[in-house]
């Protein structure tokens, strides 16, 4: 990298996000919250759990709860098909699988390009870190506060 480019990159801090699509939503979570991506296999439904918990699956000898972000955010319902993926997300001691229709990959986003979340009381807005606006052929990405999302999901599941 040329010295001028290196200085410009240092002057503009970036954050890396794991980006994916579920339903009509294009979402990103901080890459440090993602352990790995798996094919969505068979899920075992659990009785008397919130509707956003699709079930559990076995992963590396552990039972992994699988979350439907569309239901959690009141934006519809995810479907599991042959191309569906799960990403294993973690924050603190909480680990969960999350349904993704399409994995878009890792994206480095300049911190200055992250806009604050929109004001509003819906479930999606309260779990956002911010939004990256559309540019060129890139669509807007809603950046999730994954730590808050998993904590809220756990609280809702335990409260039932």
Curated annotation (Swiss-Prot):
Domain CheW-like residues, every copy: 14-155
Cite the InterPro entries for this sequence. Answer: CheW (IPR039315), CheW-like_dom_sf (IPR036061), CheW-lke_dom (IPR002545)
Tell me which PROSITE patterns the record gives: CHEW (PS50851)
One Pfam family cited in the UniProt record for this chain:
CheW
The alphabetical list of record keywords is:
Chemotaxis, Transducer
Record's protein name:
Protein FrzA
Check the record and name the Gene3D superfamilies matching this protein: CheA-289, Domain 4, SH3 Domains
**What species is given as this protein's source?**
Myxococcus xanthus
Q: Which GO terms describe its biological process?
A: chemotaxis; signal transduction
Q: Which GO terms describe its cellular component?
A: cytosol
Functional note? Necessary for proper aggregation of cells to form fruiting bodies. FRZ genes define a system of signal transduction analogous to the enterobacterial chemotaxis systems.
PANTHER family under this entry?
CHEMOTAXIS PROTEIN CHEW (PTHR22617:SF23), CHEMOTAXIS SENSOR HISTIDINE KINASE-RELATED (PTHR22617)
**Claim: GTP-binding is one of the keywords in the record:** no
Q: Which domain of life is it from?
A: Bacteria
């Amino acid at each position: 990298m040329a010295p001028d480019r290196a200085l410009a990159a240092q002057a503009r801090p970036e954050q890396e996000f794991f980006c994916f699509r579920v339903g009509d939503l294009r979402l990103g979570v901080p890459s440090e919250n993602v352990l790995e991506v798996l094919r969505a296999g068979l899920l075992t439904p659990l009785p008397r759990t919130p509707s956003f918990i699709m079930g559990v699956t076995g992963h590396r000898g552990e039972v992994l709860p699988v979350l439907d972000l569309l239901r959690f955010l009141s934006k519809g319902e995810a479907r599991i098909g042959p191309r569906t993926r799960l990403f294993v997300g973690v924050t603190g001691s909480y680990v969960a699988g999350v349904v993704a229709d399409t994995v878009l990959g890792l994206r480095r986003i300049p911190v200055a390009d992250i806009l604050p979340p929109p004001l509003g009381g819906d479930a999606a807005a309260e779990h956002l870190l911010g939004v990256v606006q559309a540019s060129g052929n890139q669509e807007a990405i809603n950046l999730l506060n994954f730590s808050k999302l998993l904590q809220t999901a756990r609280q809702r599941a335990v409260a039932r």
